[in-house]
């Protein structure tokens, strides 16, 4: 039994560290830029590929959102979205370090609102996760894509989906 628990712990540790390799973080950041519709030059892409930030917060956020969707628990989804805001706060820091300035302030603002629940943005997302505002973009589909891509180690695709969510929120805030 101890061996089984030890093996499980090692697997979990290995699985978490996989998501945090520079290549995977870079893929996520490049995908995020695509989702928000930021054009990256080759220097910016190379810089992002070398970023060594950890993105453990995304793992936690996606687990909570996924579990909340499956169990229809608004509180879990709400907590997951708040955690997602905390995770997204690292994105502008990494972009700034790579000389990317487009939408950085907007991303910071949305991340801050998500992480603190300011202006009811988390409630807006919860309400609109079923179907989002006048553009009829389905945020729940973007969340589910981000989660599925993350689980399958498609960090670029997960980044595109999260970037698309943030892009929709930036557009909705204008």
From Swiss-Prot:
GO cellular component entries: extracellular region; lamellar body; post-lysosomal vacuole
Subcellular compartments: Secreted; Extracellular vesicle
UniProt PTM comment: Probably contains disulfide bonds.
UniProt keyword DNA-binding present: no
Record flagged with keyword Lipid metabolism: no
Residues spanning the signal sequence: 1-19
Glycosylation site residues: 156
Keyword annotations: Disulfide bond, Glycoprotein, Secreted, Signal
Family, per entry: Belongs to the Sct family.
PANTHER family for this protein: PROTEIN GP17, SECRETED PROTEIN A
Name of this protein: Secreted protein A
Organism whose genome encodes this protein: Dictyostelium discoideum
Lineage of producing organism: Eukaryota, Amoebozoa, Evosea, Eumycetozoa, Dictyostelia
């Amino acid at each position: 039994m101890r061996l089984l628990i030890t093996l499980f712990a090692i697997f979990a540790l290995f699985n978490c560290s996989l998501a945090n390799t520079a290549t995977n973080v870079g893929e996520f950041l490049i995908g995020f830029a695509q989702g928000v519709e930021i054009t990256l030059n080759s220097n910016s892409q190379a810089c992002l590929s070398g970023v060594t930030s950890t993105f453990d917060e995304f793992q936690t956020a996606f687990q909570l959102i996924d579990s909340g969707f499956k169990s229809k628990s608004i509180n879990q989804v709400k907590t997951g979205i708040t955690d997602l805001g905390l995770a997204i706060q690292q994105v502008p820091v990494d972009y700034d370090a790579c000389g990317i300035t487009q939408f950085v302030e907007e991303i910071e603002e949305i991340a801050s609102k998500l992480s603190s629940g300011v202006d009811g943005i988390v409630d807006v997302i919860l309400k609109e996760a079923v179907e989002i505002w006048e553009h009829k973009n389905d945020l729940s589909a973007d969340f589910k894509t981000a989660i599925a891509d993350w689980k399958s180690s498609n960090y670029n695709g997960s980044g595109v989906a999260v970037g698309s969510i943030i892009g929709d929120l930036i557009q909705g805030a204008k």
